Amino acid sequence: MKALLYWKHRSAGASLLFLFIFTFTLTACGGNTESNARSLPQSHNSTTPNTSSATSTAQIVLGRQPCPAVVSTPSHWDSIIGTQNGVSRIEGVNCATLIGVPVLQALVTVRYEGTGSYLDVYVFNNITGANPVQLFKLQGLNKGGARISKYNTILTAEVDLASGVNSNQPGTGVIQDLFREFKWSDGAGTFVQVTFPGIFPDLTRYQAEADQEQVNQGHQPWKLDADMTANALAVNMLKWSTSAQTTIVSGGGSHDLNAVVTVKSTSPGGGTITVTLSRLEGNANGGIWEATAVQAGNMATITAPLNRDLLTSPVTVAGSGSVLGGNIGRVLILDHLYNTIGHAEVKGTTGAGNGNTTFSASVTYRSTFRAGAEEGVVVLYIEDHTDGSLATAVMEKELLGA
């Protein structure tokens, strides 16, 4: 399957956040549905952050905050990081409360001259002290970018040179297409890669915040409608007709935070999917809808891997489904561009006849991004045997290890 839909990088803008999200963030990394995925640790300073001499704030505040004047200039960080004149330079310094305590940390980015325009990303604590403590370092992001999210995580963007949109392109023709998110983990003592819960219309928080800004400016207003978002998912990911019928099961109102919507195909078999959606960052005042799960009712389920798990290839996909002629359907692994990078035919348990049964399939995939993990989707497609169209599907968000 080729890329179903590609959402270009756009500048993210501000969106309103409710008080319960603020309270939610105070828990840092524990007990948060935004951080339940197994994560990839990154290089870090093993020393426990010392906040006694750090720059304190009155409270934990969501999003970027003004840096203390003494650390806000790029020149302050040249000697700390060790930039080289004519080779590298400090590109940006931004501050926020990133580790779950009311103390400012600094996100410092370093840009390299020459082909690739590579970016290194650093996070420091004790930023006004004589010896700031490095908490995180991520190097070599091709044409990279980094910023602080409205959820106090680190968002990065870079070029995946081997991806479907950049492979065989000249250097001037490549674009940012690989987006990652890193969140502070007390247990790991550093920032670890986590998954954004969304499947569609955005796979990553970087893209979602950019989409929110576009919607705030009056573009793509359908993303404010749960029905239309569920329909767009069916059109783009199952190739259903735009006239597929949607029905609100719960929520979905102008001030609701969650919604469940069924979408019914117009094909002769008339298959149905159930789409679960939530508002971006819990913002009921104009927050866009993000589909977080797709279910097939009694037709099929996926029991493994767990939603938002960290996968390695080959991955075992297990579940249940209705068998007809020995076949249940197809399992696909979709990468960060919704391209298929692994697939397997799914058959029922040996000896099972027609009807509902369990299955287990080993799926080998190969990610085009080899420098870490990427956000993707595991999909179970069930075909309509009357015309060969897709009757229904199960989709789960995952973190795809290289």
Predicted regions and their residues:
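Acidic, small-residue rich beta-repeat scaffolds with periodic aromatic anchors
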Residues: 23-26, 30-41, 49, 54-69, ...
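Repeated scaffold domains used in trafficking and secretory/extracellular systems
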Residues: 91, 140-149
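Acidic, divalent-cation-chelating loop motifs in proteins
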Residues: 92-101, 126
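Short beta-strand edge/turn micro-motifs at domain boundaries
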Residues: 128-139, 177-200, 271-300
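Acidic/hydrophobic-patterned starts of short beta strands in beta-sheet-rich repeat architectures
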Residues: 99-110, 152-158
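Short glycine/acidic-enriched loop and turn motifs that connect beta-strands
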Residues: 111-115, 161-166, 267-268
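Solvent-exposed serine/threonine-rich low-complexity stretches and specific carbohydrate-binding patches
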Residues: 136-140, 246-250, 341-353
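Ser/Thr-rich low-complexity repeats and stalk/linker segments
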Residues: 299-302, 309-402
